[in-house]
Swiss-Prot record:
Keywords: Cell membrane, Disulfide bond, G-protein coupled receptor, Membrane, Olfaction, Receptor, Sensory transduction, Transducer, Transmembrane, Transmembrane helix. InterPro entries: GPCR_Rhodpsn, GPCR_Rhodpsn_7TM, Olfact_rcpt, OR51/52/56-like. This is Olfactory receptor 56B34. Odorant receptor. GO terms for molecular function: G protein-coupled receptor activity; olfactory receptor activity. The chain crosses the membrane at residues 37-57, 71-91, 106-126, 129-149, 208-228, 251-271, 276-296.
Length: 321
């Protein structure tokens, strides 16, 4: 801790690094969380890498629906990797210090990947909406060009709109307190340590949540509402049941993702202290969706399972050689 604070004159002390204390209230027991965290991280990396490889190598999966799944897998890997290595370092090696530039970089990466995840959810909802509600027009609407434009739009939107978050945090003055009762650099947890006014930071955080994640959430739910309405009108009971089963699985993950974001944001904005439950939710909605998304969105898709067997079967590997 001796390197964490630097005294510039007799009355002014500036922070040069933060100390991430881990999960609040259970610091002496948090080592027991390391195993499930590590397993979830391994699953997130392994399952999503398999999805990416399968979609890339199997020509029959070079379709918009599976391309969005591939983008989601890449985003999930990025989202988990921006935070989990540091969390595991804290739990296993007590590596609690993090420099200000590293902390601000983590804030930017987490916000960008979270917004990207939300954007991919929206693209996938639109893709399913067009496929179910306008099946004849689907091939001409959701094309490869549409996927490219949607992906570039998401990258541009999220990359630019999240830049002010770490920039505004870096402009604050951190005078003496440098301990964050968290296991990652949460923006609102960091700026709560500032010794100057953080009104602009809080306002932009709220505006970003509503303009990006909030609007995506509304459009996603609206898309699935229209999908369910169309499905209920189908004459085939079997087709309707299959579509509703798929939509319900998707909606469970989407509801978990967006509900966790809302709870964490409201809790942070309501006060300066970060309780245990919001911190756990904050971490879980970064780690759990990347682990579950490959199962719910991908591995339940018959075409992808067939593609996986073809790509990783020995006979197919030999024939490609």
């Amino acid at each position: 801790m001796g390197t964490a604070l630097h005294e510039t004159n007799s009355s002014e002390v500036h922070v040069s690094e933060f100390i991430l204390l881990g999960f609040p209230g259970i610091h002496e027991f948090q080592i027991w969380l390391s195993l499930p965290m590590a397993l979830l991280y391994i699953v997130a990396l392994g399952a999503n890498l398999l999805i990416l490889i399968t979609i890339y190598l199997e020509p029959t999966l070079h379709q918009p629906m599976y391309q969005f799944l591939g983008i989601l897998a890449a985003v999930d890997i990025g989202l988990a990797t921006t935070s989990m290595p540091k969390i595991l370092a804290i739990l296993w090696f007590d590596a609690k210090t993090i420099s200000l530039p590293e902390c601000f970089a983590q804030i930017y990466a987490i916000h960008t990947f979270m917004c990207m995840e939300s954007g991919v959810f929206l693209c996938m909802a639109i893709d399913r909406y067009v496929a179910i509600c306008y099946p004849l027009q689907y091939p001409s609407i959701v094309t490869e060009a549409f996927v490219i434009k949607a992906t570039l739009s998401m990258l541009l939107r999220n990359g630019l709109l999240t830049i002010p978050v770490p920039v505004l945090a870096a402009q604050r003055q951190y005078c003496s307190r440098n301990e964050i009762d968290h296991c990652l650099c949460s923006n609102l947890g960091v700026i709560s340590l500032a010794c100057d006014d953080i009104t602009v930071n809080r306002f932009y955080q709220l505006a970003l949540a509503w303009l990006v994640v909030g609007s995506d959430m509304i459009l996603v739910y609206a898309s699935y509402a229209l999908i369910i309405r169309s499905v209920l009108r189908l004459n085939s009971t079997e087709a309707a049941s299959k579509a509703l089963s798929t939509c319900s699985s998707h909606l469970i993950l989407i509801m978990f993702y967006y509900t966790a974001i809302v709870i964490v944001s409201v809790t942070h904005l309501a006060g300066r202290r970060v309780p245990l439950i919001p911190v756990l939710l904050n971490v879980m909605h970064i780690v759990i969706p990347p682990s579950l998304n490959p199962v719910v969105y991908a591995l339940r898709t018959q075409e992808l399972k067939v593609g996986f067997r073809k790509v990783f079967s020995l006979s197919e590997f030999v024939s490609r050689k």
